[in-house]
Regions:
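Extracytoplasmic substrate-binding proteins
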Residues: 76-78, 159-235, 256-258, 309-366
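A short, structured surface patch at a secondary-structure boundary
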Residues: 88-146, 150-152, 156, 255
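Short helix-initiation/N-cap motifs at beta->coil->alpha
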Residues: 72-74, 129-141, 260-269
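Alpha-helical, coiled-coil/dimerization segments enriched in small aliphatic residues
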Residues: 236-264
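Short, Lys/Arg-enriched N-terminal segments with co-localized hydrophobic residues
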Residues: 1-11
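Proline-aspartate-enriched helix->loop->beta-strand connector
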Residues: 132, 140-153, 169, 268-284
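Bacterial Sec-exported substrate-binding components of ABC uptake systems
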Residues: 10, 17-18, 23, 33-95, ...
């Protein structure tokens, strides 16, 4: 998948139609993947059909205001009405806002927006919006000037959220660092922005695939996987990071799950060799390649290198090793590497296409 072959005007009709198509593909895949077992066929068919029946119905659910919510930092925020002007200083929440169809309400987004392909593909106009800064240095002046009704911030900017509240700007902290927290984040943002029905459809789409994928790879071997970080092959994600969920959802085992760091952890070559993973998966935005690892003499004794089981996550659209709504597609991709007999490349590409057509309004190219 590389560039969009065409853009679509996103509307409710397209949303319902593409969501139904996306879910139908999930249903067909589940039935085909389990074709070797009659009992498995029946159970998977019933589960998938039930989910399809629910998810193909998109309900417009209104929110009553005033609305009081608790954000993912435990802060209480009250809204008198649905926000009309929205800012985001976190690419995770910005991508989510696009998935909820709120690009026209954005008045400011995080720094380096022009480096994110998803923005150029789904909503090119937002790239030129005022810069709200980074997770390390928030641009309070620009935010005040943009006068948003709400600004979404990462957990690292919790103190900034309190500062903004003192300036009269509603601030909501999000922290989607595992599958349940991502679901909670989608629900929270959907409720605040009066998009509950679409948020539910998004969550249901994600949950349906993950449930089906669990069925499809159950009973298979569980390969050990080392996830190499963006900065270096010697950085990785432990059990407290979303990337751990990415691997387990793909039917793999994170060799670094013993680590409890809440950010990328630095490890040694010796530690990687001791873990001796079956596969090495490189983060999407890494500045090095699979060939760099395959040619690294320090890793010559690693099973993943010996067997040439080293891959890099796609980054044509967005980094699926981050907790964006489409991150479950990263699990599909990894599953297609770990379990190619159960998760085909064609299915992976179809899921990517249907998901972005349904929730972001563009068709990726193959």
């Amino acid at each position: 998948l590389h560039k969009p072959i065409r853009r679509k005007d996103f509307n409710m009709k397209n949303f319902k139609r593409f969501t139904a198509l996306f879910l139908a593909m999930l249903m067909l895949f589940s039935l085909a993947a389990c074709g070797n077992s009659t009992t498995s066929d029946k159970g998977t068919e019933e589960a998938t059909t039930s989910a399809f029946d629910v998810m193909s119905q998109f309900n417009e659910i209104g929110v009553s205001y005033p609305l009081t919510v608790t954000d993912q930092a435990g802060r209480t925020v009250t809204f008198e009405k649905a926000p009309e002007k929205i800012a985001s200083s976190y690419y995770i929440s910005t991508s989510l806002l696009l998935a909820l169809g709120l690009q026209d309400k954005l008045v400011g987004i995080e720094a380096k927006a022009n480096t994110r392909n998803i923005y150029k593909l789904a909503a090119p106009a937002i790239v030129s919006l005022p810069n709200m800064g980074t997770a390390k240095e928030f641009n309070t002046e620009a935010c005040v000037a943009a006068a948003p009704d709400v600004v979404f911030l990462p957990i690292k900017l919790k103190k900034t959220a309190d500062t903004l509240e003192s300036l009269g700007i509603k601030a909501v902290v999000v922290n989607p660092e595992d599958q349940s927290l991502l679901e909670e984040c989608i629900t929270l943002v959907g409720k605040i922005t009066n998009n509950v029905g679409r948020a539910e459809a998004l969550n249901n789409s994600i949950k349906t695939f993950l449930a089906d994928n669990k069925t499809n790879v159950s009973g298979e071997n569980t390969p050990s996987v080392y996830l190499a970080g963006n900065s270096s092959v010697l950085s990785t994600a432990g059990s407290k990071m979303y990337q751990n969920t990415l691997l387990t959802n793909a039917g793999g085992k994170n060799v670094a799950s013993e680590l409890t760091d809440t950010y990328w952890a630095n490890v040694s070559y010796e530690q990687i060799l001791a873990w001796n993973p079956d596969y090495i998966v490189i983060a999407a935005d890494a500045t090095y390649s699979a060939d760099d690892i395959l040619n690294d003499a320090n890793l010559a004794g690693c099973n993943a290198v010996k067997n040439k089981n080293v891959v890099k996550l796609p980054n044509d659209i967005e980094a699926w090793d981050s907790p964006v709504p489409g991150s479950f597609l990263g699990s599909i991709y990894i599953a297609s590497v770990l379990h190619p007999e159960k998760v085909t490349k064609d299915f992976y590409e179809t899921c990517v296409t249907k998901f972005y057509e349904s929730f972001y309004g563009f068709t990726p190219a193959k």
